[in-house]
Amino acid sequence: MNREHKIRGYRNMLGLTQEKLGEELGISKQSYYNKETGKTQFSDKEKLKIKNLLIPLFPEITIEDIFF
């Protein structure tokens, strides 16, 4: 599975739209879209926030699992 599909899959598991996850990260829907599709990179802070949102579903998940 490519990176884009992995990140979208995790977002869907959280039940969040691109707009809502963007809000969680403090960025616009367009900025989030650009990051999810690989046009721009997630910052380390954003990666950590996404990981922390996923911890309740996947207690052992790592940033590497999500983004690489």
Regions found by a protein language model. Give the residues of each.
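A short, Lys/Arg-rich alpha-helix, primarily the initiator
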Residues: 1-13, 61
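DNA major-groove recognition helix of helix-turn-helix/homeodomain DNA-binding modules
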Residues: 45-61
